[in-house]
């Protein structure tokens, strides 16, 4: 009997020990250490893309950090936690970064707000790659352009013939120069030109609006602007043969 009790005692101690270990290793459901990723913001609003401040970065990240915390505690609000942004995963302070030349990696750590217990613990240093800032071209202004295209009949110019307005060399050159003055890294492949021309009589100059729009996939620019143009069609030479 003593042997049996001894065996049971041994198993009892072992069971208690195992339970204790499990309890120590269990992560509470509201522990911020559960957060491993933070979504990247579409852009970072800044006064100077070459010197994006810590405060501007935090503003850009606020909504996505909140979503990450709410993945731990659904009812959490921005008042329940605080976060900061660092240069690396060692907590080196960050003052400014340059987002004009390319993407930049920063590290975010989230901790509970003072005297708040909705969330506990803290995250590690979570890497977030901030996207290169696209220059907004919506403020670009270009002088009125004179555009001359060829048509089979200048009095009955078709929509297809009017597409030549979009690639007219002088217009395209003026647009590119104006954009590069604001966004030096931009090129002709970053934007597209369209017009509001209706088919009809262009034997005399006609006022039209040309739209210059940054392509969605452009890594350098965003936005669009309008250009006033006077379009005239002249008779196209007859096709050979």
Swiss-Prot record:
Protein name: Spiralin
Signal sequence, renumbered to the chain: 1-23
Annotated source species: Spiroplasma citri
Keywords: Cell membrane, Lipoprotein, Membrane, Palmitate, Signal
Main localisation: membrane
GO cellular component: a single term: plasma membrane
Highest taxon listed in the record's lineage: Bacteria
Family assignment from sequence similarity: Belongs to the spiralin family.
Record text on subunit structure and interactions: Seems to occur as dimer, tetramers, and large oligomers of identical chains.
The UniProt record lists the keyword Membrane: yes
Annotated function: Major membrane protein of spiroplasma.
């Amino acid at each position: 009997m003593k042997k049996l009790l001894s065996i049971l005692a041994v198993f009892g101690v072992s069971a208690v020990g195992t339970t204790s270990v499990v309890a120590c290793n269990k992560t509470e459901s509201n522990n911020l250490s559960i957060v491993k990723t933070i979504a990247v913001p579409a852009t970072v609003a800044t006064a100077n893309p070459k010197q994006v401040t810590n405060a501007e970065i935090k503003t850009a990240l606020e909504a996505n950090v909140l979503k990450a915390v709410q993945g731990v505690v659904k009812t959490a609000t921005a008042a329940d936690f605080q976060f900061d942004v660092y240069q690396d995963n060692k907590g080196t302070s960050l003052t400014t970064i340059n987002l004009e030349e390319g993407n930049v990696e920063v590290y975010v750590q989230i901790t509970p707000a003072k005297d708040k217990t909705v969330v506990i613990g803290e995250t590690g240093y979570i890497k977030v790659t901030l996207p290169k800032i696209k220059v907004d071209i919506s403020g670009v202004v270009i002088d009125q352009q004179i555009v001359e295209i060829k048509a089979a009949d200048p009095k009955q110019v078709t929509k297809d013939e009017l597409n030549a307005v979009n690639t007219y060399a002088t217009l395209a050159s003026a647009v590119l120069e104006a954009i590069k003055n604001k966004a030096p890294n931009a090129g002709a492949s970053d934007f597209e030109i369209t017009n509001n021309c209706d088919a009809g009589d262009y034997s005399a100059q006609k006022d039209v609006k040309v739209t210059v729009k940054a392509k969605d996939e452009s890594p350098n620019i965003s936005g669009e602007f309008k250009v006033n143009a006077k379009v005239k069609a002249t008779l196209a030479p007859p096709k050979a043969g």
